[in-house]
Amino acid sequence: MSNQLIYTGKAKDIYSTEDENVIKSVYKDQATMLNGARKETIKGKGVLNNQISSLIFEKLNAAGVATHFIKRISDTEQLNKKVTIIPLEVVLRNVTAGSFSKRFGVEEGLDLKTPIVEFYYKNDDLDDPFINDEHVKFLDIANDEQIAYIKEETRRINELLKDWFEQIGLRLIDFKLEFGFDKDGKIILADEFSPDNCRLWDAEGHHMDKDVFRRDLGSLTDVYEVVLEKLQGLK
């Protein structure tokens, strides 16, 4: 049946469509942190995230990156290819910040000589623990070839994103991606790309991402609107 709720997430709900290989993602006006321990309704956030993510995924598709994105169909809705999500949060870091700085006792804002790719096991009960390649294989999440592909694709996506954000005066600090298997068993980029799952700093070092909510730095939607406007001007 179409339009049946399949999954309720922190930032969006997923519904079935008439096509068994296509889902509808509906973005919500909700901001969370600490794995959902703190929740807040922020009017307009869903519209902004849907617009930003749609724009980024359109550009990734055009650049030859295989993604689940099909098209945006309303202010808060988009159609996506149905995938089986790989239970990994794939984090790429260009600059020290957040949990990385805390874990290794280093200040924020240091450029990393080489971008670092990290894996976190997607499991709310375990608070998404930091894991390595051997853990990924032990948990039967992915094999060596799949791990290598995910890392390679993440680095390729990073180079594209860094260039786009540099063009609009924003520094891409780090970001989180999720991948999934499509109906043919191919690994493709899934989920979303918005200031919810990346860190962006402007030329003055101001946070242009969800850290505004995490650190109570001001209006989240005001910041997201600036990011959207900048992206809309990207050539």
From Swiss-Prot:
Protein's UniProt name: Phosphoribosylaminoimidazole-succinocarboxamide synthase
InterPro entries: SAICAR_synt/ADE2_N (IPR028923), SAICAR_synt_PurC (IPR033934), SAICAR_synth (IPR001636), SAICAR_synthetase (IPR050089), SAICAR_synthetase_CS (IPR018236)
EC number(s) reported in the record: 6.3.2.6
GO process terms (BP): 'de novo' IMP biosynthetic process; cobalamin biosynthetic process
Keywords, ordered alphabetically: ATP-binding, Ligase, Nucleotide-binding, Purine biosynthesis
HAMAP family the UniProt entry points to: SAICAR_synth (MF_00137)
GO molecular function annotations of the record: ATP binding; phosphoribosylaminoimidazolesuccinocarboxamide synthase activity
A Pfam family hit: SAICAR_synt
PANTHER family: MULTIFUNCTIONAL PROTEIN ADE2, SI:DKEY-6E2.2
Annotated source species: Streptococcus thermophilus (strain ATCC BAA-250 / LMG 18311)
Leading EC class: ligase
Family stated for the protein in its record: Belongs to the SAICAR synthetase family.
Protease in keyword set: no
Reactions catalysed: 5-amino-1-(5-phospho-D-ribosyl)imidazole-4-carboxylate + L-aspartate + ATP = (2S)-2-[5-amino-1-(5-phospho-beta-D-ribosyl)imidazole-4-carboxamido]succinate + ADP + phosphate + 2 H(+)
Signal peptide range in chain numbering: none
Pathway: Purine metabolism; IMP biosynthesis via de novo pathway; 5-amino-1-(5-phospho-D-ribosyl)imidazole-4-carboxamide from 5-amino-1-(5-phospho-D-ribosyl)imidazole-4-carboxylate: step 1/2
